[in-house]
Structures are given as C-alpha cells and as structure tokens.
Amino acid sequence: MLPTADICDKYPESILIAKPIFKDFGGRTAFFGKAVTLKTLDDNTKVRSSLETDGTNKVLVVDGEGSMNCALLGGNLASIASENNWSGIIINGCVRDQLEIIVEKIGVKALAAHPKKSIKNDGGEFNVTLN
C-alpha cells in the first residue's frame, strides 16, 4: 500500500482529501477502496442494503448531511459489513454501538456517536456525487 502522502505527491491534481473532521470508530484506522456513495438523511435502510452486498475493495461513503439526530451505523451493520468484506465506511453523520464496532476488522469514520437509531423509510439515493 502506497502511503497517502506519496499518493498526494504523485497525483496532486487528481485526488480529493476528506476534511479531518472524522473520528475513527472501527477496528482499522487505515483503509482504501473504490468509493460507493449514498446520500441519506436520518434513514439507514440503504446503508444496510449496501453493506449486505459484496464490498471487496470498496468503501461506503455516506453523506448523512452531518445530521446529529441519530446514528446511521451500529454494531449489527458493522458486523454485516465486515462479513461482506467492505474495506471501510465513512459517514458524514453518526454511529452507535461503539464497543461493537471497534472489534470489527473494518474501518469506520464518522462525525460522532449518538445512541438513537435511525428511521427506516427506504430513503436516500445511491451513486451520487458528494462534495
């Protein structure tokens, strides 16, 4: 694996770097893969359906619009992601079940932890361009 700084040096015009506002919650702090994008607000139905697919060499990037209303990922979904070989999950929003997530061999980055579960209305949109 090529160090991030070396990738930045080699491809300065081709890469985008996530702002350092995300905290590590998973069992791995370094991960990489093809980005699979999802935009959703306070609804993790599509997070689950994504993580139930083969995630080999993929990272799920969820734009939860920075919501602090509930968690979009918990221990059960982190376990599903690990079982399906996802490299990692980045959430512009919250997670819960921190002690369950940290034992999974998957990278998880999010803004914060929140104990409340999300709604389940099948909301959200896949494969969107995120800023």
Task: For the regions a language model picked out, list residue spans one by one.
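Feature captures the catalytic cores and cofactor-binding loops of soluble hydro-lyases/lyases
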Residues: 1-131
